[in-house]
Amino acid sequence: MPVVRKIFRRRRGDSESEEDEQDSEEVRLKLEETREVQNLRKRPNGVSAVALLVGEKVQEETTLVDDPFQMKTGGMVDMKKLKERGKDKISEEEDLHLGTSFSAETNRRDEDADMMKYIETELKKRKGIVEHEEQKVKPKNAEDCLYELPENIRVSSAKKTEEMLSNQMLSGIPEVDQGIDAKIKNIISTEDAKARLLAEQQNKKKDSETSFVPTNMAVNYVQHNRFYHEELNAPIRRNKEEPKARPLRVGDTEKPEPERSPPNRKRPANEKATDDYHYEKFKKMNRRY
């Protein structure tokens, strides 16, 4: 009888390790994807090297101006372009619109533009393409010296430009919200400071006062002194005389009676009652003081 061997399944220890490796690879791929997304979201610091290597693209108009008849490059000359190259510039200058002529001030400063300008100037200096405008000095006459200003009178605009740049840099920084707790603390501190100031002012007033000299001395002087002032336009008082009795005559049996004024007698304009006079005087005194 042939011996039949039983085939048993062997457990592979490598299966678990392979699963772990697959999981770790998936995690690593996810991390790399997230890092790439984060790098794309980031703003590039400074000027990119690719932009410096590529350089600026020269427009066709500049090539036409430099070599309109294609003497350097060769080829057919396009007469239509030569005729129409100046018309576009004239039409753009004539068409002045409010939307294009005025621009809103953003009060922000682009640092990359300044960096590019600095790099271009340095490259021109190294290549020797710098325009020596400062070195070209014209010979001065004696009359030109009269129009020159001394250094102490010249107004330097360096401070203004520095302040403008600092303000622009600060305006580009975003503000951070501190939260409600910080606002509440600021309000409490301001209220405490107000209370302290009021208390200090009251204490100063108390210290300055003395028992010998009252604070309302000037007011009391004016109030009491007003009664000693004589009025210039005061109405003239008339002393009223008592009516005289008629003299007795021989044969008069009736009692003497005072003379009566006629009933239709007109009163003078200056004649007033005593109450009205004092009331008007009081009103005038209050107006003065």
Swiss-Prot record:
Biased composition (Basic and acidic residues): 232-283
Modified residues (Phosphothreonine): 253
Record bears the keyword Nucleus: yes
Entry keywords, A to Z: Centromere, Chromosome, Chromosome partition, mRNA processing, mRNA splicing, Nucleus, Phosphoprotein, RNA-binding, Spliceosome
Classification via InterPro entries: Tls1-like (IPR010756)
Taxonomic superkingdom: Eukaryota
Annotated Pfam families: Hep_59 (PF07052)
Positions where Phosphotyrosine occurs in the chain: 147
Annotated PANTHER family: SPLICING FACTOR C9ORF78, TELOMERE LENGTH AND SILENCING PROTEIN 1 TLS1 FAMILY MEMBER
Cited function: Plays a role in pre-mRNA splicing by promoting usage of the upstream 3'-splice site at alternative NAGNAG splice sites; these are sites featuring alternative acceptor motifs separated by only a few nucleotides. May also modulate exon inclusion events. Plays a role in spliceosomal remodeling by displacing WBP4 from SNRNP200 and may act to inhibit SNRNP200 helicase activity. Binds U5 snRNA. Required for proper chromosome segregation. Not required for splicing of shelterin components.
This protein's name: Splicing factor C9orf78 homolog
Native source species: Pongo abelii (Sumatran orangutan)
Top-level taxonomy: Eukaryota, Metazoa, Chordata, Craniata, Vertebrata
